[in-house]
Amino acid sequence: MKKIKYFLQFLGIISLFIIFKVIGLTLSRIFSGYLLRLLGPLFRSKKIIHSNLLTAFPDSSEYERKKIIKNMWFNYGQILAEYMFIKDFRKNSNYSKKIIIENFDELKNVNLDSKPVIFISGHFNNFELMAMQIEKLGVDLAAVYRPLNNFFLNNIMEKIRQKHICKKQVKKGVSGTKKLLEHFKNGTSIALMIDQRVSQGIRCNFFNREALTTTIPAQFVKKYQAKIIPVHIERSRNNLFKLKFQKAINFSDDEDIKSITLKLNNILENMIIKNPDQWIWSHNRWK
């Protein structure tokens, strides 16, 4: 039964991709944005989204939460449409010029040739463009990804990611962590999303509630004195993207795994608070 469900989802997405290719990026964003805004509230994740927003913003009004959800689904739809044009964002200057780099000096201030760094972020807006653009800036990069449950779609997505987003893709999990270590020792920087629940993590405050959080960045800091560079991407109303680098974080020797992880969670919180409708709220973060 699950295979049939996944195959039907696969056919639906492929059909949409064909439509996107025919009508072009601008119309695809509008069509897909409104489509997801219409269908999104029907998905099973509806309760999780509402619960997550109440956890993060307990003093928010129902109107404010509904507005965030509505904008999130529209944004989700735009991201879906943009997958069909990832190759263009990679190779076509008319697309890539829509991605503006802010605080590029923060990268220049870190000598990546002598020692790799850990880029940390979350699922903001079209998060796939972050790893793609960092690699295009000349950074030797490995990006961690979580395979899709739908194996029909996952096969396609893995090929898209490896060919057009970031050549060095590392699957999330124990084997992936070993691969990350291998890459890092060979001078490759790491791009890691820290906003999802992980079974191997530690319980750490995130919006004043404990959530299982990855300790991979903290472990690299303690063992290899790795520098952490927070980065996130924002979409403006005219569909320009701003890729924003923050200053590299240096941690003191007396900071432990928990305190480092908490500090990174706090940074992530601030990113979300600034643009709550550009973060994907459908993940069961506090399970």
Located regions from the model:
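Membrane-anchoring hydrophobic helices of lipid-metabolizing enzymes
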Residues: M1-I118, I156
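Catalytic core of membrane glycerolipid acyltransferases/transacylases, capturing the structured
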Residues: D113-G173, Q200-C204, E210
